[in-house]
């Protein structure tokens, strides 16, 4: 590296206090100086004079570094961190108090442990470097697949419990893997885009094998949102219009498989489960259809404050209760036990957190961080919408409300929110350029009477 240019870069970087930002900024300055030097060389200057002129045109390195230090600084997300912790603590207390004096299948200590683990995972996600995760996106996808695949045959032997971890992993963490993979494969043309879509297709097939259509819907929506985010910026180099059409067509074709998945689940329910669990099949018939009339009747008698009339509830073991009161229908239990106002307060707090993170995501300039945040918002939004529909008596899929319902879901959602806050904190990091596309070069070519033999196979595009 030329001495004058390297000295200039080092002097400028000495003024930047954020060590994580230095490599990217140094690369940008170095590239600009080299371009200026090459322009000077083309004008007939010697090497030393060209370097000196390039450095002179860039100005004072101390002033440049000071200006960069003013712009590129970490932005701690203390307020969002406290808000997310408070909402998770509220969700833990709701789960604990609503099931404390009831015949719940989930012990109260489990809710406390889930809340503590969620706080730990939030802190862990916040401490992680999202840009470092992007560099190992392929390995993360492989590890994700290794964890998910062994869970597929387990549900055959214990379908009521063992599917839950796989469902939550696909529902919440799939958008993260897709966002990181899309960022990692950017700039690689059709192989990169098709590779990311192949990953989405594989995860969609896994959703049907578990089976759970909510996770399948998450795969479709995440692929559409994140795919369009990258193709509209032509980060794969295939053309904005063509890439956008391909992603939209892929998501549409994927959505057509929803009826196929529904028929597949119906076949399992009617043919397989009765043979495996003849005594429990009545309990398995989906509560979405079996208990919906009870839920609607209970909601019709709900008050703004105070419990509902016990005669509107189901009596089990001499205790009036809401169907699935300690799991997916916890919000219905909240309405019937405390009233509409506490329900609106809980949902409003989550909506405030969601909109706050959405606003920060829109303002975020860094592509990788923005993609991760879009994936997280998609995961949270899908869970929230379908859970609200279920708890208000309009069921489509069984879903748990983020940070309020479900211990496993709370832990994974808190981890993802921590990653989003990490992306907000590092939003001032310099943007990394897409990888250069590899162009196929003929092994033997004849141009203008010159025979060329290529032994490397591929070269980097300029």
Specify the residue positions occupied by each region the protein language model found:
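N-terminal, intrinsically disordered, low-complexity segments
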Residues: 1-46
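Cytosolic juxtamembrane regions of integral membrane proteins
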Residues: 45-102
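Loop-to-helix entry and N-terminal half of a specific, functionally important transmembrane alpha helix
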Residues: 360-398
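Transmembrane alpha-helical segments and their membrane-water interfaces
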Residues: 108-133, 171-188, 222-237, 355
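Hydrophobic alpha-helical transmembrane segments
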Residues: 113-121, 335-358
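Hydrophobic, glycine- and aromatic-enriched re-entrant/interface helices and adjoining loop segments
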Residues: 240-343
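A juxtamembrane structural motif centered on a specific transmembrane helix
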Residues: 194-195, 199, 387-394, 398-462
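Hydrophobic alpha-helical segments of polytopic membrane proteins
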Residues: 195-205, 214-260
